[in-house]
A protein has these predicted regions:
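Alpha-helical scaffold domains
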Residues: 1-174
Length: 174
């Protein structure tokens, strides 16, 4: 309890409230070091994720931490209250496909493609009524294009995978 009080007092004095709230949650929910890295990488600030941090997470995809990494990614991707969470998850997923455990990440993306397609219609208005979801929608479209280009999955096959019919990545003769 004293460590939580200390984090709170530091956040008030330094003005880093969001970061320190994240640290409090990390302690409260007993997140592993890898889970904390994913939370940091996909945090709700406007900065792009650190490449060094993404490299560490990519290494984690080759370990028993894989499922906890992906659990946080999918949870944050579905968050409709923070545009930065969804955007950074897409950045991280693209990075993990290139630098992480490709087969495992690919399988996760294929199984959760409907979540990524859902983000193509992401909409969030700020306090002034301005839609701040545009960048997320664009990134989702670019991610799907990247995914199709890298994995020879056509638009029809992507829809089939999203519907769960297992039609992704076939020979595609036509």
């Amino acid at each position: 309890m004293d460590s939580m009080r200390k984090v709170y007092q530091e956040s008030v004095s330094t003005g880093n409230m969001k970061r320190n709230i994240r640290e409090l949650k990390n302690k409260m929910y007993a997140y592993s070091e890898m889970e904390q890295m994913v939370r940091e990488c996909t945090c709700n600030d406007a900065q792009t994720p650190s490449e060094m941090l993404m490299k560490e997470i990519a290494k984690g995809t080759f370990t028993v931490e894989f499922s906890s990494i992906m659990t946080i990614v999918w949870k944050r991707l579905k968050d409709k209250t923070n545009e930065h969470h969804a955007f950074k998850c897409l950045v991280l997923l693209e990075f993990l496909l290139q630098h992480g455990n490709h087969e495992m990440v690919l399988s996760q993306v294929q199984n959760n493609l409907h979540h990524i397609q859902g983000v193509t219609s992401f909409s969030l208005k700020n306090a002034n009524g301005i839609d701040v979801g545009h960048d997320v929608r664009e990134k989702a479209h670019r991610f799907l294009k990247f995914f199709r280009d890298q994995h020879s999955v056509g638009p029809v096959d992507v829809a089939a995978v999203a519907l769960g019919s297992g039609g992704g990545g076939g020979s595609g003769g036509g």
